[in-house]
Regions:
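N-terminal cap/lid segment of alpha/beta-hydrolase-fold proteins
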Residues: 28-69
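The serine-hydrolase catalytic nucleophile loop
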Residues: 83-94
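Short alpha-helix in the alpha/beta-hydrolase fold that links the catalytic acid
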Residues: 90, 249-259
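Conserved alpha/beta-hydrolase
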Residues: 97-116
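Alpha/beta-hydrolase active-site loop
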Residues: 123-145
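Hydrolase active-site cap/lid region
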Residues: 166-213
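Short beta-strand/loop motif that positions the catalytic acidic residue
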Residues: 233, 239-241, 245
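C-terminal catalytic histidine-bearing segment of alpha/beta-hydrolase fold enzymes
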Residues: 263-307
Length: 307
């Protein structure tokens, strides 16, 4: 819950900056550069990168038969607000994709939550700072010799879906296709519903449906034309969305397909059932398995098209 996180942020803000500066040398070896974990059918390796002066914690997932002298398609996965890359892992996306032959990079947005390992306080995070983070991550991933530069994909959950869509609109030549999971295309509308005008947004902190956020978070999306902006991306997009999502209504994804992603290769996949809510992968195994199957099949098609 973002509201609970911001309360904790206030209590810990004095010490957090000093701790962030030493994250890579933390007492927790599991977040140290190069820390390796063997998973079923793949290997996870901690790999930090930077956005300017900010340290970004991330992990590569490599296929079981990974050979650094070869090149692999890559998926960069972005989490939602108040979440972390560990939640993306819990949803099984990185593991399944690596088992399918992809190199995957997941990371914690700077200020994306109180539980993340990257720099920046939660109250200083905005959709646009996350967009800058994702672009920096893309640049970092593209420096790896084993990354197939012609097959870079983005996957984003919730706010990470919106951030991925905005980033792809700016860097459409770098992104072959996108997989968006219940993308938070509602955020600008939420801001306008909460405040009658941008002048009504309070200083320091503000309220959104997800809870208390920094005022800049609301200000930076208040006048955002979401669909007009994301429509600059002309590649294929698959959106997967639960029909019982109350936080980000399904209708927002319907509108995205109707107004922004109008190409023949773009599609909206509904997830049905009582558990098809926001974040359905966490408690709806059948829905998660179906989403991952159709999602990876969608990406696989874009590999075969150019072989």
């Amino acid at each position: 819950n973002a509201e609970e996180q911001t309360e904790e942020a206030e209590d810990s803000s004095n010490s957090e900056g000093e701790e962030d500066a030493d994250l890579e040398e933390s007492d927790n070896p599991e977040i140290e550069e190069g820390y390796t974990t063997e998973l079923e059918g793949c290997t996870k390796v901690v790999s930090w990168c930077k956005n300017g002066d900010n340290n970004i914690y991330g992990q590569f997932y490599y296929p079981e038969d990974f050979d650094e002298t070869k090149t692999y398609p890559v998926i960069i996965m972005s989490h939602g607000i108040g979440s972390t890359s560990q939640m993306v892992e819990r949803a099984k996306w990185p593991e399944k994709a690596a088992q399918d032959g992809y190199v995957v990079y997941t990371f914690d947005f700077c200020g994306g939550s109180l539980n993340g390992n990257s720099d920046v306080d939660f109250m200083d995070m905005t959709v646009m700072t996350e967009k800058e983070d994702l672009s920096a991550v893309m640049d970092f991933v593209k420096t790896k010799d084993y990354v197939d530069q012609d097959h870079l994909f983005l996957l984003g959950q919730s706010q990470g879906g919106l951030v991925s869509a905005l980033t792809a609109a700016d860097r459409k030549d770098d992104v072959v296709a996108m997989l968006l999971i219940y993308p938070a295309f509602c955020i600008a509308d939420n801001a306008r519903e909460m405040y009658d005008s941008a002048y009504d947004i309070p200083e320091d902190r503000a309220e959104m449906p997800v809870g208390t956020v920094g005022s800049e978070y609301v200000k930076t999306v208040y006048d955002l034309d979401v669909y007009g902006t994301i429509s600059a991306y002309d590649g294929d997009v698959m959106i997967i969305h639960g029909i019982n999502d109350s936080l980000v209504p399904y209708s927002y994804s319907e509108k995205a397909i109707e107004e922004a992603y109008t190409g023949e290769g773009s599609v909206l996949i509904p997830i049905y059932g009582k558990k098809s809510t926001h974040g359905f992968e966490m408690n709806f195994e059948e829905g998660r398995d179906y989403a991952e199957t159709v999602g990876l099949e969608f990406l696989d098609v874009h590999l075969k098209e150019e072989e």
